[in-house]
């Protein structure tokens, strides 16, 4: 049995072709932080005949089962990523919509200190930073605009 079949069964979901295909697409590195509409278009490009309503339904089931995490970034559109990843925070460009994942030990430690200061046992957290492209908004045409500076 494949890992994806087992993952669906472990989540209490029946193994169906649409669920397997959607899970396969979500596992592609370039398909993190993907909307339902973008996922649907990707499936069409792969010649998969899965309707948009099915994509929405499966993503909601995956979210409920903990297979994916739903994010509501600025702009109101939900995007999804697999939940199996390590903890990370997000930096979102408001000009082009690029979502950059990052981890920073100093930020993580500071969040723990703040929680302790207010006598709160931190069980979970998420950090979203929003900003505009520092290179005059031309990031829409520049694929390297958001690469880390050295």
UniProtKB/Swiss-Prot annotation:
It is found in: Cytoplasm. Keywords: Cytoplasm, DNA-binding, Iron, Metal-binding, Repressor, Transcription, Transcription regulation, Zinc. Fe cation binds at residues 87, 89, 108, 125. Its main location: cytoplasm. Residues 1-84 are annotated as: DNA-binding. The keyword Transcription applies. The gene is fur. Belongs to the Fur family. CDD domains: Fur_like (cd07153). This is Ferric uptake regulation protein. Residues 85-143 are annotated as: Dimerization. GO terms for biological process: negative regulation of DNA-templated transcription; negative regulation of siderophore biosynthetic process; positive regulation of DNA-templated transcription.
